[in-house]
From Swiss-Prot:
GO CC, one annotated term: plasma membrane
Chief location category: membrane
Ranges for domain HMA: 2-67
Entry's transmembrane regions: 89-109, 114-134, 153-173, 185-205, 348-368, 374-394, 680-698, 704-722
EC numbers for this chain: 7.2.2.8
Protein's UniProt name: Copper-exporting P-type ATPase
Lineage: Bacteria, Bacillati, Actinomycetota, Actinomycetes, Mycobacteriales
Similarity comment text for this entry: Belongs to the cation transport ATPase (P-type) (TC 3.A.3) family. Type IB subfamily.
Length: 780
């Protein structure tokens, strides 16, 4: 399968989406599409036999006006469309004002008629109902061609009918017999309907313009994110000179120079120089970071002072910035469950509105009303219905939220990320690399009697050098002289073994090596390390327990505040780790986590998540390592630290770009605020149509008022979604448990399960039995 994206510029609401696709040639039926009415982008999955060019040409023949350009270039179409509508709106409004005044005057005071007044009104109205209203007529014609209908069909029909009726009443000298005087004008029973046709055009164009402008604002976050990339790079030549090239021509392993005020052109490794780098464009963190040789840097960040020589490791579409843009776009293109329901309703909405309009006309005729009242009520029904509000209720909120999340360092992969947060009551944290910095260091080496500490450390470091586990890397980095290792084997969740200088060496957990340790020295060293919250690693050489290596990992400064913020919001927290219970309990006590689940094998983390879910909890998991991948996938909501492994990032629903736990409560707040916005939009969209159509059918609304109400409805939905752009403006999660947590304007997420704090739920989980499952390679 191959995936392409097309810009559907001729689509305005959910009703438009199925029309073209349902009428494409049968030979192109071997593809599936996902069309988003807010972004107007169709994601098409093609089979191998289907040619991309065939699909594009078929869609163009269906008059869907495709554009296969870059996705970010397509975002500019919203701004261009807003300018296009503004021109038509300005001309229509300039003609509508005198037209409305003259029409009311001629209707209320027939004595003001003068020779040629009919032609004056016609001259003012025709440009409005034809040229200015052409965007509606064009889509309506397309829909009629393919036996479909949309909001534009309703508007075009209303404008056309009002224009034809106006020509008949003006040139046929039709006189109304109802509602004489000024009340006739207010109640919409005038014999002149030019101002109605023009007024509908003006109000709907105004709504379309403001909606298009708001939608272009909704994409600003994504455009700003893409604009962070550097335009050029100063590549270092072998002779020491520099050559400036476009950043998109930079290749991996090329070295480039970055000076103060310049943007780093690609992800890479600092080879030479020191500088302070602003990470805020990518991670949202305001505090600059000091980088030195050997540090990794991210493309799109800005050097504040100092000079760096960077070796490119990821360029072009492989950079972290490009990946962020792709994730945000993918999130914006997906349709939530609520939106799929709205789309199904919208697909039958327009035919139902036509039926209601026809029944309204028949009903008023049976009641003995005159043609003016019949016509006014039917037109009001047509123009007041707003399927557009239904189509925009969810995708606009998700589009704004995903863009705002990217600015805050939160990448949401799709609508599941939003929907899963509604019932989350428990947040489970991994320890190493998540709650702690992951930068482990050897803090102490204790040798058994008859052994030397240097010898123990060197033998252990030699074996650990073949593993990529965080503890192994720390031990391996503690010494530079290492012998070759043979027969290396990693036992996930336990440790490693190998042969060094013909001596069998095992390094790993006390439970694996020293289940029965008779050395008082080693037992004391282990106890002291665990009381300090450090990890104790035993070393065995030729079957003899010869030493204990204590590895320390600093707790992140943001961990305690983040956990306190979660507690203030009503969430329960748990620590899930393969470390020993004493060390895990020390870390949990320092941070304030409710529950500790320690000494867990990597494959058993999934079982722990399942146990929590079986007890009625809705679980969010935060992790960063390879062995966290299955648990992140099993949890109701998986959050991966951005600097984590590809496995963790791939399994998670949300990626936290910042290496800062303050973003965890912010993420849950953003998702909850987004779901509240979507719910409010849906209530408004359904409520408006349910209430407005009967009022219009009852003849209580002038068609002008109906057109204005319809335009306002869709504009209201988009504007309400745009409120999410300000999310986090007054949010401060960097709070201690002794300070009041400032939240966004909306209330915090509520606990949906009262059993969360019951005595049964508060009891710790027993470590689950080992079971066969996912075995992460060389990790414990």
């Amino acid at each position: 399968m191959q995936r392409i994206q097309l810009n559907i510029t001729g689509m305005s609401c959910s009703c438009c989406a199925p029309n073209g696709w349902n009428n494409l040639p049968n030979k192109l039926s071997d593809f599936s599409t996902l069309v988003n009415s807010a972004t107007r982008v169709a994601a098409i999955n093609l089979s191998e036999v289907t040619q991309t060019a065939e699909v594009c040409e078929a869609v163009r023949r269906a008059a869907l006006c495709t554009d296969g350009g870059e996705a970010l270039q397509r975002r500019q179409a919203d701004a261009d469309n807003a300018r296009y509508l503004l021109i038509r709106l300005a001309v229509a409004a300039a003609l509508f004002v005198p037209l409305a005044h003259l029409s009311v005057m001629f209707a209320v005071l027939p004595s003001t008629h003068f020779p040629g007044w009919e032609w004056m009104l016609t001259a003012l109205a025709i440009p409005v109902v034809t040229w200015a209203a052409w965007p509606f007529h064009r889509v309506a014609i397309h829909n009629a061609r393919y036996h479909g209908a949309s909001m534009e069909t309703l508007i075009s029909t209303g404008i056309t009918a009002a224009t034809i009726w106006s020509l008949y009443t003006v040139f046929g000298h039709h006189q109304s017999t109802e509602h004489r005087g000024v009340w006739r004008a207010l109640l919409g029973s005038d014999a002149i309907y030019f101002e109605v046709a023009a007024g509908i055009t003006v109000f709907v164009l105004a709504g379309k313009y403001y909606t298009a402008r708001a939608k272009s604002h909704a994409s600003i976050a994504l455009l700003a994110l893409a604009a962070l990339s550097a335009k050029d790079a100063a590549v270092l030549q072998p002779d020491g000179s520099e050559m400036v090239i476009p950043a998109n021509e930079l290749n991996e392993q090329q070295r480039f120079v970055v000076r103060p005020g310049q943007t780093i052109a690609a992800d890479g490794l600092v080879i030479d120089g020191s500088a302070t780098v602003s990470m805020s464009p990518i991670t949202g963190e305001a505090k600059p970071v000091r980088v030195n040789p050997g540090a990794q840097v991210i493309g799109g960040t800005v050097v504040l002072n100092g000079r760096l020589i960077v070796e490119a490791a990821a360029v072009g579409d492989e950079t972290q910035l490009a990946g962020m843009v792709r994730l945000v776009e993918q999130a914006q293109q997906q349709n939530a469950n609520a939106q799929r329901l709205a789309d199904r309703i919208a697909s039958v909405f327009v035919p139902c509105v036509f039926a209601v309009a026809a029944l309204t006309a028949v009903g008023w005729l049976i009641a003995g009303s005159g043609p003016d009242r019949v016509f006014s009520a039917a037109i009001a029904v047509l123009v007041i219905a707003c399927p557009c509000a239904l189509g925009l209720a969810t995708p606009t909120a998700m589009m704004v939220a995903s863009g705002r999340g990217a600015q805050l360092g939160i990448l949401l992969k799709g609508h599941e990320s939003f929907e899963a947060t509604r019932a989350v009551d428990t947040v489970v944290f991994d320890k190493t690399g998540t709650l702690t910095t992951g930068q482990l260091k050897v803090s102490a080496v204790t040798a058994a009697p008859g052994w030397q500490a240097n010898e123990v450390l060197q033998m252990a470091a030699t074996v650990e050098s073949a593993s990529e586990h965080a503890v192994a890397l720390a031990i391996a980095a503690s010494t530079t002289h290492r012998e070759p290792v043979a027969n290396f084997r990693a036992v996930p969740g336990h440790g490693v073994s190998g042969t060094v200088a013909e001596r069998a060496v095992r390094v790993g957990k006390p439970s694996w090596i020293a289940s029965r340790c008779n050395s008082t020295t080693l037992v004391t060293a282990r106890r002291n390390a665990e009381l300090r919250g450090e990890t104790a690693v035993f070393v065995e050489i030729d079957g003899e327990q010869c030493g204990v290596i204590a590895v320390a990992d600093a707790v992140k400064a943001s961990a305690a505040d983040a956990v306190a913020a979660l507690h203030d919001r009503g969430f329960r927290t748990a620590l899930l780790t393969g470390d020993n219970p004493a060390s895990a309990a020390a870390v949990a006590s320092r941070i304030g986590i409710d529950e500790v689940i320690a000494d867990i094998l990597p494959e058993d983390k999934v079982d722990v998540i399942e146990q929590l879910r079986d007890r009625g909890h809705v679980v969010a998991m935060v992790g960063d390592g390879i062995n966290d991948g299955p648990a992140l996938a099993r949890a109701d909501l998986g959050m991966a630290i951005g600097r984590g492994t590809d496995v963790a990032i791939g399994a998670a629903d949300i990626i936290l770009v910042r290496d800062n736990l303050d973003v965890v409560p912010i993420t849950l707040d953003l998702a909850a605020a987004t779901m509240r916005t979507i719910k409010f939009n849906m209530v408004w969209a359904f409520g408006y149509n349910i209430a407005a159509i009967p009022i219009a059918a009852a003849g209580l609304l002038n068609p002008l008022v109906a057109g204005a109400a319809m335009a306002f409805s869709s504009f209201f939905v988009v504007s309400n979604s745009l409120r999410l752009r300000n999310f986090g403006a007054i949010l401060s999660c960097g709070t201690s448990r002794h300070r009041t947590v400032k939240r966004w304007r909306c209330p915090p997420p509520t606990r949906l399960r009262s059993t969360a704090c019951s005595p049964v739920d508060a009891s710790p989980l027993r470590p689950v039995a080992h079971r066969t499952g996912v075995k992460p390679p060389t990790h414990r």
